[in-house]
Swiss-Prot record:
Catalytic reaction list: tRNA(Glu) + L-glutamate + ATP = L-glutamyl-tRNA(Glu) + AMP + diphosphate
Motif 'KMSKS' region per UniProt: ranges: 248-252
BP-aspect Gene Ontology terms: glutamyl-tRNA aminoacylation
Residue pairs linked by disulfide bridges in the UniProt entry: none
Renumbered ranges of motif 'HIGH' region: 21-31
Cofactor annotation comment: Binds 1 zinc ion per subunit.
Residues the record lists as binding ATP: 251
Name of the encoding gene: gltX
Protein name: Glutamate--tRNA ligase
EC id: 6.1.1.17
Keyword Metal-binding assigned: yes
Similarity remark: Belongs to the class-I aminoacyl-tRNA synthetase family. Glutamate--tRNA ligase type 1 subfamily.
GO MF annotations, alphabetized: ATP binding; glutamate-tRNA ligase activity; tRNA binding; zinc ion binding
Length: 480
């Protein structure tokens, strides 16, 4: 029987990349960068992007992790043309190919016991040889196919595997370094390295972008592809991401999963912009729209060196995008933060107004939601330091006067509120701060907020007047 790829693919598509995470945990920033590079390369070349879930590790793979990966990809807006495909749904296909390989002499059954393999390894180590299988079962005719066995790929014993890595250049591995890889376990399940090969073949993958930790798998996979008569993709192995201390990025460096960044109030545009620059660049340019990334991205410009993750740089980018993206769009992401923090925004200013007021001040949307709570709900008490400094006996007169002015307003907007504050200061012959600061603490509970006119307009007349009275009562009670 002839070995051939399974899927009917569009022959006009010249580039087809894939992202193939294992659902054993959340999508971390290293995986997200790999997905982004793979996605950008496909888009840059008018190609297609395939999403594949490599869930052959049945013990560690979970539906929750799969859902989290899909959520993260959707949040980042890294859409896919094909998939998601699940390896566990393709076991029949893998076993079909393995059986054909046995039939054609490309693979063989191995009946060796664990004890024999352990003894072989000890002998080879004692002789200072590289541990590898000795092909004891290659021509075995004594055992029945129904006896317990694994299946091994018959790896070439001569020559070398040579491939041109799109990031690292020429890589050559002698076949003497490679073993006869197990491609099917004794329980009948195919192994990771084999499933990957069949998937890449069936799915017409032309370019494999993945982490440098996969380099050792590549020669083994290339040899299997050659045995199948399948085309060899271009491989591009990207470097690891380290923390700012030079150590491999981990939880101790802060958030490492993509959705943690969403939870912390980052915009997807900021994270994508940061990740694309973490190992790739275009001159001195720092800010890239997604359209610019697609236009400019080339694998040849990806760095071979490890990159250092810098949270301050990501924060800077996030504030840039909060400030520069349309307020309507930012407000959609901000709404999720309010929901997470249990803040009911049904009574208060439009969220686009919050973005306009606080966009220059806040580095994250989480900070923006937390610091604008007073627009939507009452606060229990005043910030202790702010109250001590500004809610003194001398503040009663300015607060009573400005309350009187605000009560008398026919309309309620930022301009009218500003005039009321200005008139109060003029009549009392004091600086604007003598009115504005006690007023700020009175209506927000804290010593910092956007300008008082827009803050008052956003909070609303009824709440503002009630809070001013509450502050006056607080001062009088404190000084009674």
């Amino acid at each position: 029987m002839e070995l051939k790829a399974l899927f009917n693919l569009d022959p006009n598509v010249k580039v087809r990349t894939r992202f193939a995470p294992s659902p054993t945990g959340y999508l971390h920033v290293g995986g997200a960068r790999t997905a982004l590079y793979s996605w950008l390369y496909a888009k840059h070349n008018d190609g297609e992007f395939v999403l594949r879930i490599e869930d052959t590790d049945l013990e560690r793979s979970t539906p929750e992790a799969t859902a989290a990966i899909l959520d993260a990809m959707e949040w980042l807006n890294l859409t896919w043309e094909h998939g998601p495909y699940f390896q566990t749904e393709r076991f029949d296909r893998y076993n079909e190919v393995i059986d054909q390989m046995i039939e054609q002499g490309l693979a063989y059954r191995c009946y060796c016991s664990k004890e024999r393999l352990e003894e072989l390894r000890h002998q080879q180590e004692a002789n200072k040889e590289k541990p590898r299988y000795d092909r004891h079962c290659l021509h075995d005719h004594e055992h029945s196919p129904y006896e317990p066995h694994v299946v091994r790929f018959k790896n070439p014993q001569e020559g070398s595997v040579v491939f041109e890595d799109a990031v690292r250049g020429r890589i050559e591995i002698s076949n003497h370094e490679l073993d006869d890889l197990i491609i099917r376990r004794s329980d009948g399940s195919p192994t990771y390295n084999f499933c990957v090969v069949v998937d890449d073949w069936d799915m017409g993958i032309t370019h494999v972008v993945r982490g440098e930790d996969h380099i050792n798998n590549t020669p083994r996979q290339i040899n299997i592809l050659k045995a199948l008569g399948a085309p060899i993709p271009v491989y591009a192995h990207v470097s690891m991401i380290n923390g700012d201390d030079g150590q491999k990025l981990s939880k101790r460096h802060g958030a490492v999963s993509v959705m943690q960044y969403r939870d912390e109030g980052y915009l997807p545009e900021a994270l994508l912009n940061y990740l694309v620059r973490l190992g790739w660049g275009h001159g001195d340019q720092e800010i890239f729209t997604l359209e610019e990334m697609i236009k400019l991205f080339e694998l040849e410009h990806v760095s071979k060196s490890a990159s250092a993750f810098n949270t301050e740089k990501l924060l800077w980018l996030n504030q840039h995008y909060i400030r520069e993206l349309p307020a309507e769009y930012v407000a959609q992401h901000l709404a999720w933060q309010y929901q997470e923090q249990g803040i009911d925004t049904s009574k208060g200013p439009a969220l686009t107004e919050i973005v306009s007021m606080l966009g220059e001040r806040c580095k994250t949307l989480k900070e923006m939601a937390a610091s604008s709570r007073y627009f939507f709900e009452e606060f229990d008490g005043f910030d202790e330091a702010a109250a001590k400094k500004h809610l003194k006996a001398a503040a009663v007169e300015p607060l009573e006067k400005v309350k009187e002015k605000l009560t008398a307003l026919s309309g309620w907007d930022a301009h009218s509120a500003h005039e009321a504050i200005e008139q109060t200061a003029a009549e009392l012959e004091v600086g604007m701060g003598k009115v504005g600061m006690p007023l700020r603490v009175a209506v927000t509970g804290a010593g910092q907020s956007p300008s008082m006119d827009v803050t008052l307009a956003g909070i609303g007349r009824e709440r503002v007047l009630a809070r001013i009275q509450k502050a006056i009562d607080f001062i009088k009670a404190k000084n009674a």
